[in-house]
């Protein structure tokens, strides 16, 4: 399983139950990147993808996802069991946050294998880093 998170410069994800930001170009990147695999997300996350296709909205997505599937995580908890890859999409901005990405990637055996910057619709630069276990 592969997990996708959006984070700010301090690894923040949400504030008072709401996403920090969103970007239409990043949504399209996620859909294109996961083509050929299942992309799972919560019903909350699916609201921002409503104009796109190629995802499965189900609040039990991490239980239902299979080995090669992707899970886009915003509002739900997550576990590392069975996770082979983590993609961090960094807004390159600081936002207020009370929910943060708290996985110590190195301590859990993940190594950075790729990094790219994209120009978003509402962000000049979004840095996308891919980490793989092993």
Spans of features found by a protein language model:
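Enzymes that bind and transform nitrogen-containing heteroaromatic metabolites
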Residues: 1-134
């Amino acid at each position: 399983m592969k997990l996708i998170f959006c984070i700010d410069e301090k690894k923040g994800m949400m504030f008072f139950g709401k996403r920090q930001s969103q970007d239409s170009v990043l949504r399209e990147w996620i859909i294109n990147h996961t083509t050929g695999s299942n992309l799972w997300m919560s019903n909350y996350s699916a609201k921002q993808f409503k104009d796109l296709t190629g995802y499965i909205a189900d609040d039990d997505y991490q239980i239902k996802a299979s080995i090669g599937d992707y899970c886009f995580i915003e509002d739900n908890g997550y576990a590392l069991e069975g996770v082979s890859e983590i993609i961090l999409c960094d807004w390159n901005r600081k936002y207020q946050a009370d929910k943060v990405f708290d996985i110590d990637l190195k301590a859990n055996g993940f190594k950075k294998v790729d990094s790219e910057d994209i120009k978003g619709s509402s962000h000049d630069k979004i840095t996308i880093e891919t980490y793989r276990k092993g």
